[in-house]
Structure formats: structure tokens, C-alpha cells
Amino acid sequence: MAKITSLIGSGIVAATNQVGPHVKHIPAVGNLQKQIVSDQIQVRWSSTETSLKNDISATDVRGYKGHDMLAPFTAGWHSTDLEPLVIQKSEGSYVYDVNGKKYLDALAGLWCTSLGGNEPRLVAAATKQLNELAFYHSFWNRSTKPSLDLAKELLDLFTANKMAKAFFTNSGSEANDTQVKLVWYYNNALGRPDKKKFIARTKSYHGSTLISASLSGLPALHQQFDLPAPFVLHTDCPHFWRFHQPGETEEEFSTRLANNLENLILKEGPETIAAFIAEPVMGAGGVIPPPATYFEKVQAILKKYDILFIADEVICGFGRLGTMFGCEKYNIKPDLVSVAKALSSGYMPIGAVLVSPEVSDVIYSQSNKLGTFSHGFTYSGHPVSCAVALETLKIYKERNIIEQVNRISPKFQEGLKAFSDSPIIGEIRGTGLLHGTEFTDNKSPNDPFPPEWGIGAYFGARCEKHGVLVRVAGDNIMMSPPYILSLEEIDELIIKYGKALKDTENRVEELKSQKKIKSS
């Protein structure tokens, strides 16, 4: 994912090997960096659209290279050597940069603008709430009507398992951070002070705060941050194509991973393991759907040892997979749930934690004993964010967004999977409106391209050149387009993906020829 290795066009590429993902980060040097810079100039400043040019200020003309922002998940040389892609306007499934160049936003921002970029009802909901009550908090039994209404709506909407309470955050990272505090609070209340460890999975992404980055199973989030925290353990990534043994079926693979999970629990001591956290489909780690019977077997083990299940629905929630939540698709019955992103279609920062009755009853009793539940944020349940989220959920229902996703997703998935025979593609995978492409040589998970070639970064830059924005993580490409994508826009996406793929195939041939000449 771009968060873990590089933004599109970056010269930082990640190696993927048989042992684990994204373990090596190599700065672009020499011809690769020159190629990337050249591509960026060509992409960013060769606009074919003129709709915004009259609005460009002197600052825009001068450009933003060397800007003042410490940019998230961005290498320092990007800011000094490259012009950033500065987005100024959005219309439906498209965004426009400051020069008026138009891009199909195949990532929906960061997996979040499910209703596209300019849904007037969401703008109106925000404006109405700003005019009525721009802010009030939710501390000390004070609250606002939008936050109370949204809590009820979320509890009614989540049907995979009964939930009793909703706690509001500003992001998915904060939601997963909160989960750890809730679980510790819960076990302390039950007189289990040693039951504090968390198990997450290699290649998972759960956020970038101190705790949520620790939960994440991506080394780039840990390097030089003194992470992960010692109470976090990581078990196998359930990526069948990459990690299955010869002759092993998906069910057998799931059984092996479940056994490994149980062995880890027994090694650490079941009395020390508090919770297991998982995304229904792993998102930023490469779009990895679970193998057959995986969650069934994992849940049986968690129940056996009285370990809570936290479902991270930050990416999968609110229709992305063709069900309202990923838990419904994979028959997951969690004790706690994290949501964000499509909760407001990305229009306002908001996340939430859903808490089962079994956990919330204990928290209720403990807070009475202590005199308060001492956790919260200034903007927990922000009335404007909640008003926008309420309108978002209303639109999902009125427009039957689940039916819409299921109507367009087959064409989206099948159209992209038609490129599976490409000699540089190892695997194309996905479900609903989530897609992942992994580049490898010889179509094998054991034959990655040399990381210094930057194949994923090159493909991302060519997509950008052709007018599509995707996410790059090493040699993995990810897409999660808006739910409002039309069938014609899917055709456009597939055509431009194919053009970028052909460019990248040619680039690989060129690099292989250069390598052959050097070695001869």
C-alpha cells in the first residue's frame, strides 16, 4: 500500500519474499529515480483539461515542490525533488488536479469516498448542522442529537452479532487504539490483570497511532518508531497463493493457520491473550480475501480460550464487499467492531467502535465502581461529522447501495482478472469493489522482481499518466473505487489499466535486456 511503501510514482519500493511482506525498503537511485522524476513531470504538468486553469494562482503556476507540509507516508526526497499531485476539485468518480487534469479515482481517496466526490446531500447535511450547532462535546452525560441518533443507527445496522453501544472517534486508527483500552479495562474489571496481549496478523493494517501501528503487521510502520509494543503478537497472513504449501487446499491451509494460532496462544498462555483483531478482507496489506473456512476455524479457537474477536471493518464496512459489513459475508461474530471511512463517505473525519452487550455490561459496572469511564476525545461524536454520517447511511439505504455494488462488481472484477495471463502478473485477487494486482516474475510468489526496478511504482505512474489513480505498495496494486462507478467508467478503468500494464510489460522487457547485457 502507498501508506507502507510509497505513493504513486515514488522511488521507494518494497521487496516481497517468501518469509514476509515489505521487509526491505530501498531508495530509488540512478536511472530509476531519473525515470520516476521524468514520469512525474510528464504526468503532472501535461494537462489535457482546461476547466480549472483560469483559477490557478501564481503559487499554483510556481508549483509546490519543497512545500512546508510534513506529508504522511511520504519520503523526504519526494517533497524536495518532485511536484506533489495537488487535487483541487472532485466530480463523481473523478478528481482534478490544479492544472485541470482529470483522473478516475480508482481508490476512492483512501478507500473512503464511497459516494464520490461531490454528493450534494452530504454537503447540505454538513452545512445545515454547521448553521445549527457547529460543535458540542459528548463528555459528562452531555451530548448532541446527531451523535445519539447515529449511535442508534449503527447498532441497528450491524446485524452480524448484537451490539449494545457505540463509541465515536475521528478515524479508524483511533477506533483500533480505543479497542485496546476497552479490552484492558474489561479484563481489569473481571480481575484478569494478566490477560492483556493482542494477536494480529502479518500484513494487516490497523492504523498508525502508537497502538494501532503496533497491531499492524507491516514492518515499515514499526521501523525506527520502536514498535511494535511488547503486548502485540503477530500470527500468519492468510494469503493462500503466497503461503500455501505444495498440494495444500484452501481448507487445509486454513486448518494449518488455525493450528499455528492455537500453538501461539498455548505458548504465550491463554490467560495472557486478551483479543484477536482482523480485517474481513485484508486491505492495505494487499487486498487479501480469507481462504475457505478460515474465520470459522479461527473463531472456534478464540471461543475455546475466551479471547475476544475485534473485527476491523474500517475498509470493508458499509457495502464495499457487497454486504453491509464484511462480517456478514464471512459469518464473523465479533465482540467488538471498528468502523470509519465509508461511514461518512470520507466527507468528515469520523470512526466508531461498536461494543457487544457482554463487554459493554462489564464496562458499565466498572465505570460505576470507578466513578467514570475515563476515555474520550474532544471531537468524539462531533455533531457535523455525525450529521454527515447519518445522511450517508440514509443514502445507502435509499439507493440500495448493496444492490448497486453487487450489480457493478462482477464487471469490475472480471474485467481486471482478464489480464491474469500477463507474464508480469503473479496474482489478481479481490471481491466486491476491492481489487489487488501483484506483480511477480514467472507468475510465482517466489520470484519477485528486483526491488530496485520499482515495477509497482512504475505501473502506478503510468496509471496516473493515463488518468487513473491507484494505490501502490511495493509490487502490489490496490483499487477500491466509489460505489457510484458507472459501467462505462468501469470500461474506462479497465482500458487504462490495460494501457499501464502494457507500458509496464515493456519496461520489464527493457530492464531484463539491460540486465542480460550487463551479465554477458
UniProtKB/Swiss-Prot annotation:
GO biological process: biotin biosynthetic process; gamma-aminobutyric acid metabolic process
Enzyme Commission number: 2.6.1.96
Gene Ontology terms for molecular function: 4-aminobutyrate:pyruvate transaminase activity; adenosylmethionine-8-amino-7-oxononanoate transaminase activity; pyridoxal phosphate binding
Alphabetical UniProt keywords: Aminotransferase, Chloroplast, Plastid, Pyridoxal phosphate, Transferase, Transit peptide
Segment forming the signal sequence: none
PROSITE patterns, sorted: AA_TRANSFER_CLASS_3
GO cellular component: chloroplast
Chain positions recorded as pyridoxal 5'-phosphate binding sites: G172, S173, D312
Positions that bind substrate: Y205, K341
Stated role: Transaminase that degrades gamma-amino butyric acid (GABA) and uses pyruvate or glyoxylate as amino-group acceptor. Cannot use beta-alanine, ornithine, acetylornithine, serine, glycine, asparagine, glutamine, glutamate, valine, leucine, isoleucine, methionine, phenylalanine, histidine, lysine, arginine, aspartate, threonine, tyrosine, tryptophan, proline, or cysteine as amino donors.
Homology family: Belongs to the class-III pyridoxal-phosphate-dependent aminotransferase family.
Protein name as catalogued: Gamma aminobutyrate transaminase 3, chloroplastic
Organism expressing this protein natively: Solanum lycopersicum
